[in-house]
Design a protein with these regions (language model features):
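Hydrophobic faces of well-ordered beta-strands that scaffold small-molecule active sites
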Residues: 19-21, 88-90, 129-132, 158-160, ...
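Mid-to-C-terminal alpha-helical segments outside catalytic/metal-binding sites
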Residues: 2-21, 28-87, 115-123, 144, ...
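Active-site acidic short loop of glycosyltransferases
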Residues: 155, 189, 240, 303-304
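Active-site gating loops and adjacent loop-to-helix segments of metal-dependent hydrolytic enzymes
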Residues: 24-70, 202-220, 259-280
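A general structural motif
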Residues: 223-225, 265-268, 287-291
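Active-site gating/metal-coordination segments in enzymes
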Residues: 86-225
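Aromatic-lined glycan-binding groove of carbohydrate-active enzymes
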Residues: 230-278
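Catalytic metal-binding/acid-base residues of hydrolase active sites
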Residues: 24, 163, 199-200, 249, ...
Length: 356
């Protein structure tokens, strides 16, 4: 593969198209939309409190150093070639969720994000698919935004965080919230993929040192959000829902035995139809768990047909060599190929021009 070709070669898998399902872009138009908006400075102050000054001082230069990789299509293609990746499913940086925005501004945010990602896909239609955004803080607008991403912009689905502040200071929107039922139903009806990618954590200052706001919070938020989906019965009511959890689903998949035990012994946890661990086979997870042993444990917990390749490129907490890291796990060749691209293809995440 070259950095400028519009074709794919099957990467390094002998014919399997290698698909990175977890890769980010910054959509400049989104930042133009929110610039100067009421509420932006308050949100930045909250982010500073959550991340801590030390981490915030690192984040700015880190983003600046990666800005071309986040915004320049030619550089992105070069990165993909170096990594042995044929296809990226590109999603906006989670920093562009802007869940603080009111309904009117939120509509401008998702329209800009969805069209920005669609422009990347349209520029190289054999190399990219994409996820758009929806305003999780406004449950009544989710279906409209989902339709915008999938039906109007032609994207594969949307990216959401693990929770959002409630509209107008109301109750927090968890993924178990009944107000999300129309969204889950519509996503299942469309066959749209929902990428669960946490951003932020409600523990705030407890994690404001040592970058715990990311290293601990991201996997914790994944575990909490997935638990809300499981225990509330969302997956019972919407069995066709296609949800991919970033970061390997965090802490939940390899420690779900405790959830099973609670389901068996406590009536307040016996709220879903089956053992919580059984729902791992109704979800999908990316491979970004950072060690070969952790990836093997994830595959043992959920099955290789429930794992997709993910890099979190080009951020510093991501990896530039997702295929090499997959190979380092020493999986069965068939399982390895499923993770490299076969599972993603089954989810409909190949570019539309490559789908049979």
């Amino acid at each position: 593969m070259s950095g400028t070709t519009s074709g794919t070669t099957g990467g390094t898998t002998g014919g399997t198209v290698v698909v990175d399902v977890h890769a980010h872009a910054i959509v400049p138009e989104v930042e133009m939309v929110v610039a100067g908006a009421a509420g932006l400075e308050a949100q930045r102050a909250l982010d500073l409190r959550r991340y801590g000054r030390e981490s915030a001082a690192v984040n700015g230069p880190m983003i600046a150093a990666r800005m071309r990789r986040l915004t320049d299509l030619g550089v992105r293609l070069e990165d993909m070639a170096a990594a042995g990746v044929d296809v990226q499913v590109v999603s906006p940086s989670p920093s562009q969720y802007h869940y603080w925005a009111d309904a009117d501004l939120a509509r401008h945010v998702w329209r800009a994000a969805n069209r920005g990602i669609a422009a990347i896909v349209d520029a190289e239609p054999l190399r990219f698919n994409g996820f758009g955004l929806v305003p999780l803080q406004h449950p009544d607008l989710l279906v409209e935004a989902l339709d915008d991403a999938v039906e109007l912009c032609g994207l594969a689905g949307v990216e959401i965080s693990s929770y959002a502040p409630g509209p107008d200071g109301g109750r927090t929107v968890e993924l178990s919230d009944p107000r999300l039922e129309p969204f889950w139903a519509r996503a299942a009806e469309l066959g749209a993929v929902v990428l669960l990618h946490p951003f932020g954590c409600s523990l705030d200052e407890r994690l404001d040192r040592f970058y715990l706001s990311n290293t601990v919070a991201q996997p914790a938020e994944n575990a909490v959000a997935l638990s809300h989906l499981i225990f509330s019965g969302v997956l019972d009511r919407h069995p066709r829902l296609r949800l991919v959890a970033a970061h390997g689903g965090g802490y939940l998949p390899t420690y779900i035995g405790r959830s099973d035990h609670a389901w068996e012994v406590r009536p307040d946890a016996h709220t879903c139809a089956e053992l919580p661990s059984s729902y791992l086979r109704r979800l999908w997870f990316d491979s970004l768990v950072h060690t070969p042993a952790a990836l093997r444990a994830l595959v043992a917990a959920v099955g290789a047909d429930r794992v997709v390749l993910g890099s979190d490129a080009p951020f510093d907490m991501g990896v530039d060599d997702p295929v090499a890291r997959l190979d380092a796990a020493g999986l069965d060749p068939a399982d390895r190929d499923r993770i490299a691209g076969g599972t993603a293809a089954g989810l409909g995440l190949l570019p539309r021009k490559l789908q049979s």
